[in-house]
Amino acid sequence: MEQIVISGTGVFTPEESITNEELVRAYNEYAENYNLANKNKIDLGEKVALELSNEEFIFNASGIKNRYVMDKKGILDPNIMHPILDKRTNDQPSILAEMSLKASKDALDKAGKTPDDIDAVITACSNLERAYPAISIEVQELLGIKGFAFDMNVACSSATFAIQAAADMIRSGSANTILIVDPEICSGHLDFKDRDCHFIFGDVCTAMVLEKKDTANSSNCFEILSTKCITQFSNNIRNNFGFLNNAKKSSPLDRDLLFMQEGRKVFKEVVPMVSQLIIDHLYEEKIEIEEIKRLWLHQANKSMNDFIGKKVLGRVPEDHEQPNILQDYANTSSAGSIIAFSLYSQDMKSNEVGVLCSFGAGYSAGSIILRKVS
């Protein structure tokens, strides 16, 4: 079977960031204003007073201390509470494409490739800026890449599903070298007026170059030994925004048009599903648990990852074995595990093995077994 490698990764990080302290200050001011404006109805039991937030609650619930965003001014304004992004004409690059370009150039440089070497582009992320034309085709045009491109969405698992799709296409001969981009503006689908989730997400974009091992000349190259993806339908993580909203007479302010989740149910159901996926995947490939030197997991919740790591390894993972970037980036959906992989893979030795795994809405989960080549 043709050996396929990830030969380069790139990360675009927005310039602006928001600390828990800043986020709490803005939310609490909004909540206090809401409670004051609705005092009479709250006293009559017609409305429920909003509970204030605090930094300790956020960190204990998630492990998050900071998040990067495309716009912090609107998010931190108690009268707005959402990012404000400039509207662009059709002749200007879309925001997702612009982010993708920056991450792509980083990945191409690390892989030692130019756009002329790429013959396919996959945009894999949890939220696409528009229905059509595909963001990936725009990225293809802006980079001057020939071949073909397409978008795909499997929520937080999009990047690992894209790795499987790209590896399969290269093996089948559909393409030789593929660029994957994962642009995520998660702040755009987050309700910053909701205490239970206003702290969860951040914005970022990652990129990867996949190619045949024989053509790779990267100094940090990982062979894709095996891929395994699973899905299981659940409403516990949901966003009802879509092209039929107008036909359904939905209001842009409807709560279900933003991110919603049943956090406790998600934790209870996803942790065993993902743990078993990784364990089964390693068993099927006849790889012993002791051989695993690194777990690059989806960065959604530190406690969730701690449980998964302990279940897979049979012990509490050392910090270097299961790198955590949540405290700095928050949940960046499909990009999270790729950030962890990009930042914490160069120290691995030749032939050492690790598992890249992402999981989330759907439910969906993708496991990629990687071996360091160079």
Regions found by a protein language model. Give the residues of each.
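Flexible, glycine-rich active-site loops centered on histidine and acidic residues
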Residues: 174-205
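Acyl-CoA/ACP chain-elongation machinery
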Residues: 182-183, 190, 232-239, 301-304
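Condensing-enzyme catalytic core mediating Claisen C-C bond formation in acyl metabolism
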Residues: 1-93, 194-268, 276, 371-374
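Claisen-condensing/thiolase-fold acyl-transfer catalytic domains that form or cleave C-C bonds
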Residues: 101, 108, 127-128, 141-142, ...
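Buried hydrophobic positions in well-ordered alpha/beta secondary-structure cores of metabolic enzymes
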Residues: 6-8, 58, 107, 121, ...
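Short acidic, glycine/serine/threonine-rich loops at helix termini
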Residues: 17-18, 132-135, 163-164, 189-195, ...
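Conserved beta-ketoacyl condensing-enzyme motif
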Residues: 6, 50, 54-154, 282-305
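Short beta-strand segments
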Residues: 7, 124, 153, 178-184, ...
